[in-house]
C-alpha cells in the first residue's frame, strides 16, 4: 500500500447495459460500479468470501451519497479508488472516486458502512474482526496525508440568494 494515495480497487469498462436514453452512463449504473468497488475493498480488508463464510461477518451499507462530475459513455475505461475517511470499532466512511484513464474525475460516492454478523437469520452490528480492524488501521495510516475531499460530508440543498 503506497502512502498518501487512494487505494485502487476496481477497473472496468462502461458496457451498453449501463447506458441510458441520454447516451451516457445511467445513475443506477454508477451506484452498481461503486457497490462493486466496495466489494473489491472487502477482499482487501479481510472480508473476502472465505472470511465471510468462516466468521459470518459482512458489511451492510447505512448511507450513500453520489456525486456526478462528468459523463461516462459506452466503451469508456473507468477506475475506482478508495479513500478511507474515518473508521471506528464497527463503522467506516469511504470516499470512492471514479476516474477516466487520464485521472479526470467522473463521479464519487461517499459511503457509510457497518460491520454486521449474520447468525440464524438475524443481522446485528458487531466490532470488526481483528484482521479487518488491522487492515483498516493500516489503510488509515497510509492515507493520513490525503486531503479531505471538499464534498465529503455535504448534504443536498438548493443554493438560495441572500
Each language-model region and where it sits:
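Short polar catalytic/cofactor-binding loops
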Residues: 12-20
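HotDog/MaoC-like acyl-thioester-processing domains
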Residues: 1-4, 9-10, 68, 73-77, ...
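Small beta-barrel nucleic-acid-binding modules, principally OB-folds
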Residues: 56-74
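Active-site helix/loop of acyl-thioester processing domains in fatty-acid/polyketide metabolism
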Residues: 29-53
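A conserved, well-ordered hydrophobic junction motif at loop->secondary-structure transitions
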Residues: 21-31
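A structural signal for short, hydrophobic beta-strand segments that form beta-sheets
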Residues: 61, 82-84
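Short secondary-structure junction/hinge motifs that connect adjacent elements
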Residues: 48-57, 152-155
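Short catalytic/metal-binding and nucleic-acid-binding patches
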Residues: 3, 40-44, 59-64
